[in-house]
Structure formats: structure tokens, C-alpha cells
């Protein structure tokens, strides 16, 4: 049945508004003892100022925040009174609302059809973003070190590229270890998932666990990891048995780098990785192009400067090589596609870019801890609402118009409509009308730009879609 845009949006809207209506927030505030009796500052007021109307709770003057709150809700508070309301109970309240949103089934309605879905039920991308907070909080949020980073907050995220669902989420100190978070998330894996991990999460033990659970992975390999392949000319005993120590030979990474042309890829299908912890896997070497290498060397130079670290000449030399390990069957992911699939991981960089450039999640002055945390969780709730809406619009635009949505453009436009969403939050019909208008705006102005000979996410995932450019139509195979 061919449903209208409004009919398609109706169940999404009902799920979206479940935990953010004023009535629900008031009831939750009483349950959590945030509000014990009728007061002039309610749970709904806290949500209004932290989620809906204020851009920077942790950096805007309190007088301005009070003024905005009064303009929207009529609530009158002094700056000192508002500052007192940013307390531990406020933080717990907002954190709980965010937790409820993460548990919703909302993303079950945002899957997009693509070729990868026939092999991988979910494409799990994991990464972290970090930002500095006032040094007065270094005992609570110690930073990762480096130039002036005495205090910082790190946010870990794992989400599904098919649907936009947030699987795992953690807010913690900047010094927290990425690899530890990756290991903690293993229990949420399901057979048929594809995990794409970068070097920060590299662990042979974790990859082995994924393999045992029926989960697929594509991971960068640390170049100091010993790698062995079958010896084409092993030594034999007189009885014909292979001498164990000659069955495998160690790979020389520098040698492979010199053999490959820029942009070229080679594969060893049965590689033996590691010494103490052993993993049998496909091993793919991809040499960077000159432009890619230049970009990477620039990043290395920046790290050397900011973290006061010196990279060896060998490290800089092998920086021209990407080495991947994967247990995905060759029939599903040929050698040439391994690097391409890995680049899907960069989508999470776009997600984090919106957090900082559009939502100003990293903007904070030297204010108390609870005010910064209210700002943080208020922003995360707003981000989740905009992100969920974006993934629904992406699915609808593909389904109805066969177009690819630009995630970055769409998030910005949806954020512009956030206050209108707040105004209509109690009325399902009004929200549906608003999102229908938004859909038509995104159809007009939110489509993905296509650069010459550069594949988009839809191209890599094998999504069937169309776009107009240079008087021609294109479909991703």
C-alpha cells in the first residue's frame, strides 16, 4: 500500500514524542524527586531551557538564560535561582530522559534498503569525540594529556549505519581508553552484524570474540603486529611432514609497501596474525595515493606538535600503507571493496562534526560541574531527536523520491525547526504536519552533493537511487 508522507510519519511521531511531552516530564520529575511539590521551576522548564530554546547553557550568561525561559514559558527566576536549579538532581533527570530515548524502538522505522543488508544485518560504527572542559574539573574529568588538555569529556558512540540506531553510548573522562569501551560492547553483538573499527579499538582478542559470535569485522591492523602467511616452500621431514617452524613466514611490511603502486591493493586470504593471541583472517594491504599520504603526514605532524611526541622515520614511511583484517567472506566483500567498506566509518566523523559545529556541545565557560552536565545531556537529547528525524527523512526521501539525503545539511535544517517542534510537541497531528513540511524542504535543499568520481555512502552500500547532474541520471549498483 502506497501511504502518504503524513501516514508514513504518524507512527514515527508517536514514538518520538513519548518521552518528551510536558505531561510525561512532569510525572518523571515527581518520580525522581526532582520536583516534590508544585514549584515555579518544573521538570518541563528544565527541559525547555536545556533542550529546546538555549544554544549554550554552559556558556551563556544566567541573566540571558532567565530571560529566554521567561519569554517562552512565563517562568520568572533570578540568575542565582536558576544557577541553584542546575544541581545533581537536574543532571540525573536529563540523563534519565536521554537513557529512555536511547531505549526506544524508533530506529526500527528508519532502515534503508541496500545490497549490504542481505549480508550484514547491522553495520556497527564505533568512535569517540572529545572536548575540553574547565581545568577546575580535572579531578572529575581528567583529560587525555597533551597540550593544555588537563580536563576533558570523551563521548563514545557505536551506531548502526542502516538505521541510525545508537547501540552503545558512554560519557566519561577524556583519559578513558577506547579499547576498553570496545571490549565492553561485545555483549551487544548479534550474528550477522558487521563491525567497522579503527586502530584505537584494535584488539586481537575482541576480533576473535566477534568471529566466535558469528559477527563480521573490518579493522585496521596495527603495523607493529606480527603477521604470517603460508610458506610456499616449507621444509619437510624425511617422513613427509612439514617442519612446524617453516609452515608460515613473517610478512615484511616495508617490502610490500615498495611492491605496491599508489592506490593499489593486495590480499592474503589465510593470514596468521599475532604471536600470543592468534587470529586467522583475511589480510588486505592498500597503499595510499600521494594526496592521501600527504594528508596523513600532515596529521602526524600536528600530533607531534600537540602531544609532544616524535614518530620514527619507519612509522612515517609505513604511514603510506593501510592494512586491514576482515573475516567477511570474499564472495561478499572482494579485496577491492574492503578499503571502500572501511571508509563508511568516516560517517561517524560527520555525526560528531554536527555535534560541535551545529549544536555547540563543546562550548562551556568556567562554571560548576552540574551546569556543564545539564548543558551536555540537554544537547545530547536535542541531538538524538534531530538525528532520529534525519534518519527517518533519509529513509522517506529514498523510498518516495529515490534521492540521497545529505546528513549534515539535513541535521542543520531539522535543528532550525527544533523550536517549532517544541511548540507542537503535545499535538501528534501538528508535529506530523511540521515534519511533512520539513520533508518537502529537505527534498528541495537537503540532497547530497555528488563530487566527480567520488562515491557516496549510498554508492558504497549498494543503494538504488537517482540523481540529476550534467543532464544524466545515475543509479548505484
UniProtKB/Swiss-Prot annotation:
Function of the molecule: Involved in the transposition of the insertion sequence.
Alphabetic keyword roster: DNA recombination, DNA-binding, Transposable element, Transposition
This protein's name: Transposase for insertion sequence element IS231F
GO MF annotations in UniProt: DNA binding; transposase activity
GO biological process: DNA transposition
Parts of the chain that traverse the membrane: none
Keyword DNA-binding: yes
Keyword DNA-binding: yes
Native species: Bacillus thuringiensis subsp. israelensis
Family recorded in the similarity comment: Belongs to the transposase 11 family.
Signal peptide span: none
Entry-linked InterPro entries: RNaseH-like_sf, Transpos_IS4, Transposase_11
Biological classification of the source: Bacteria, Bacillati, Bacillota, Bacilli, Bacillales
NCBIfam families noted in UniProt: transpos_IS4_1
Record-linked Pfam families: DDE_Tnp_1
Amino acid at each position: 500500500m502506497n501511504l502518504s508522507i503524513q501516514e508514513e510519519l504518524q507512527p514515527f511521531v508517536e514514538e518520538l514524542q513519548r518521552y518528551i511531552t510536558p505531561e510525561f516530564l512532569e510525572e518523571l520529575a515527581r518520580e525522581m524527586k526532582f520536583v516534590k511539590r508544585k514549584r515555579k521551576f518544573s521538570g518541563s522548564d528544565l527541559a525547555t531551557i536545556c533542550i529546546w530554546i538555549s544554544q549554550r547553557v554552559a556558556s551563556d550568561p544566567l541573566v540571558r538564560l532567565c530571560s529566554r525561559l521567561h519569554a517562552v514559558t512565563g517562568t520568572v527566576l533570578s540568575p542565582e535561582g536558576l544557577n541553584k536549579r542546575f544541581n545533581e538532581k537536574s543532571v540525573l533527570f536529563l540523563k534519565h530522559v536521554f537513557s529512555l530515548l536511547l531505549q526506544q524502538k524508533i530506529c526500527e522505522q528508519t532502515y534503508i534498503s541496500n545490497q549490504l543488508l542481505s549480508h550484514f544485518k547491522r553495520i556497527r560504527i564505533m568512535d569517540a569525540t572529545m572536548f575540553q572542559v574547565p581545568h577546575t574539573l580535572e579531578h572529575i574529568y581528567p583529560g587525555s594529556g597533551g597540550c593544555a588538555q588537563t580536563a576533558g569529556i570523551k563521548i563514545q558512540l557505536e551506531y548502526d549505519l542502516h538505521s541510525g540506531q545508537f547501540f552503545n553510548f558512554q560519557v566519561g573522562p577524556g583519559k578513558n581508553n577506547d579499547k576498553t569501551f570496545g571490549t565492553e560492547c561485545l555483549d551487544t553483538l548479534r550474528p550477522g552484524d558487521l563491525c567497522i573499527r579503527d586502530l584505537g579499538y584494535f584488539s586481537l582478542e575482541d576480533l576473535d570474540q566477534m568471529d566466535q559470535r558469528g559477527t563480521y569485522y573490518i579493522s585496521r591492523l596495527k603495523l607493529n603486529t606480527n603477521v604470517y602467511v603460508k610458506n610456499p616452500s616449507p621444509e619437510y621431514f624425511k617422513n613427509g611432514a612439514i617442519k612446524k617452524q617453516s609452515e608460515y613466514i613473517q610478512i615484511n611490511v616495508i617490502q610490500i609497501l615498495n611492491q605496491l603502486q599508489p592506490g593499489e591493493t593486495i590480499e592474503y586470504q589465510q593470514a596468521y596474525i599475532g604471536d600470543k593471541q592468534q587470529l586467522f583472517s583475511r589480510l588486505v594491504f592498500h597503499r595510499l595515493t600521494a594526496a592521501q599520504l600527504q594528508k596523513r603526514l600532515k596529521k602526524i605532524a600536528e600530533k607531534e606538535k600537540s602531544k609532544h611526541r616524535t614518530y620514527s622515520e619507519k612509522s612515517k614511511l609505513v604511514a603510506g600503507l593501510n592494512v586491514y583484517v576482515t573475516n567477511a567472506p570474499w564472495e561478499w566483500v572482494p579485496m577491492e571493496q574492503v578499503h571502500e567498506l572501511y571508509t563508511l566509518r568516516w560517517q561517524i566523523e560527520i555525526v560528531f562534526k554536527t555535534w560541535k559545529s551545529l549544536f555547540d556541545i563543546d562550548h562551556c565557560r568556567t562554571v560548576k560541574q552540574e551546569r556543564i552536565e545539564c548543558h551536555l545531556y540537554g544537547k545530547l537529547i536535542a541531538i538524538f531527536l534531530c538525528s532520529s528525524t534525519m534518519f527517518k527523512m533519509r529513509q522517506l526521501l529514498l523510498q518516495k523520491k529515490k534521492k540521497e539525503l545529505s546528513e549534515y545539511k539535513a541535521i542543520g535544517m531539522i535543528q532550525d525547526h527544533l523550536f517549532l517542534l517544541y511548540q507542537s510537541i503535545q499535538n501528534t497531528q501538528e508535529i506530523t504536519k511540521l515534519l511533512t513540511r520539513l520533508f518537502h524542504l529537505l527534498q528541495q535543499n537537503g540532497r547530497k552533493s555528488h563530487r566527480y568520481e567520488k562515491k557516496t555512502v549510498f554508492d558504497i552500500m549498494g543503494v538504488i537511487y537517482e540523481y540529476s547532474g550534467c543532464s544524466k541520471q545515475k543509479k548505484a549498483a
